[in-house]
């Protein structure tokens, strides 16, 4: 029987991404745990020694043991593609990272814009039937990111590991007809950076693995305000120093701005479609004319792949060229935007008014999986 007092407990929040899953409890200023969205299975059976071999590994432990494992990434381009693996990921977060019993806490799970109906319903089904949570809610990642900046109307420009999207939001509701998506994001930038560095002919004293390329990307990559001018600069002016794990120092140049450039020119990767600025402009102009000026004046960046130095300035410059003359444009780049969706979820689930939003186990029992379509939008 449902106990309404359970809604007074801090809720569990899972913000699921292609690369990382952020988990924590409502009312806190940031996620307690950030775990790689990966599950690894042993490639070979261990010889019998009396000790039982683990059947799978999750997150950083899987990456650490990756040579002996077959790695599965259950979230691809923002969407869940393997429910068995996502169940293992969530179970790991509940039991080992947060140390909570799912049957004792309300749970909010974030979802990408335009999440397919079957994925929404499967998430609810798994939470209620597999984890037996007492209450559940599914919330749009972009809307939550906007909430974290204390706004309810604006355009969210979100770029994570697997997908980049522009989402117009009016009074707390996303406008799905105007959402733009680009399947170029952090992992594509890392892969391109790796190819560019290897093609440069530079000898690396250690293997250029994904973790190393990710670190170079996060520490040194930037978005050029004028890519053509950057190309004409002297080599010594663009070189930046990077210290490798073995202590060797290397110097990297043009590749540091060439890799993130694909966010603005995805055709460089053979992906047809508009870049970031054109996506933002398209999303806004698909909205009612009465709110377009408001949206241009409240653009909020979200996600780890918007953290590149210079990205906000480049986006502003290109949007000023695309927007009608005289339309004021404001871009907010919160320093904690890597976690902004999670923070937004922490804020809203802490509000006393949110209690009426939860789908309870009793609701699920009465209405079934379709309840998520009526209650979460």
UniProtKB/Swiss-Prot annotation:
Main location: cytoplasm
Annotated Gene Ontology cellular component terms: cytoplasm; cytoskeleton
Localization per Swiss-Prot or TrEMBL: Cytoplasm, Cytoskeleton
Gene3D superfamilies (UniProt xref): 3.30.420.40, Actin, Chain A, domain 4
SS bonds (residue pairs): none
Keywords recorded for this protein, A-Z: Cytoplasm, Cytoskeleton
Entry similarity comment: Belongs to the actin family.
Descriptive protein name: Actin-related protein T2
Classification lineage: Eukaryota, Metazoa, Chordata, Craniata, Vertebrata
Gene name of the record: Actrt2
């Amino acid at each position: 029987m449902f106990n309404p007092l359970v809604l007074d407990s801090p809720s569990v929040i899972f913000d699921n991404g292609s690369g990382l899953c952020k988990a924590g409890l409502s009312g806190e200023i940031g996620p307690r745990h950030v775990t790689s969205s990966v599950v690894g299975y042993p490639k070979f059976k261990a010889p019998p020694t009396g000790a039982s071999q683990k059947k799978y590994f999750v997150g950083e432990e899987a990456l650490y043991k990756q040579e002996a494992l077959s790695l599965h990434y259950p979230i691809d381009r923002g969407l869940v593609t393997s429910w068995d693996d996502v169940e293992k990921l969530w179970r790991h977060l509940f039991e080992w990272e947060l140390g909570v019993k799912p049957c004792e806490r309300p749970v909010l799970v974030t979802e990408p814009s335009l999440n397919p109906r079957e994925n929404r319903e499967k998430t609810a089904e798994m939470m209620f039937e597999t984890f037996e949570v007492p209450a559940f809610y599914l919330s749009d990642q972009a809307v939550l990111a906007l909430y974290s900046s204390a706004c309810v109307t604006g355009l969210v420009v979100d770029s994570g590991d697997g997908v980049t999207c522009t989402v117009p939001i009016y009074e707390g509701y996303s406008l799905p007809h105007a959402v733009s998506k680009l399947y170029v994001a952090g992992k594509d930038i890392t892969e391109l950076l790796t190819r560019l560095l290897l093609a440069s002919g530079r000898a690396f004293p250690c293997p250029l693995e994904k973790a190393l390329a990710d670190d170079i990307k996060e520490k040194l990559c930037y978005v050029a305000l004028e890519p053509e001018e950057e190309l004409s600069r002297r080599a010594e002016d663009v070189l930046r120093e990077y210290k490798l794990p073995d202590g060797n120092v290397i110097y990297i140049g043009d590749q540091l701005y060439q890799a993130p450039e694909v966010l603005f020119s995805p055709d460089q990767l053979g992906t047809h479609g508009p870049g970031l600025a054109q996506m933002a402009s398209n999303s806004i102009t698909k909205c009612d004319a009465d709110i377009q000026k408001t949206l241009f004046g409240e653009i909020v960046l979200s996600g780890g792949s918007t953290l590149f130095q210079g990205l906000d300035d480049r986006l502003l410059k290109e949007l000023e060229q695309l927007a009608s003359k005289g339309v004021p444009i404001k871009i907010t780049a919160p320093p904690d935007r890597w976690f902004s969706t999670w923070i937004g979820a922490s804020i809203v689930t802490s509000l006393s008014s949110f209690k009426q939003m939860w789908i309870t186990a009793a609701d699920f029992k009465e209405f079934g999986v379709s309840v998520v379509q009526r209650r979460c939008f």
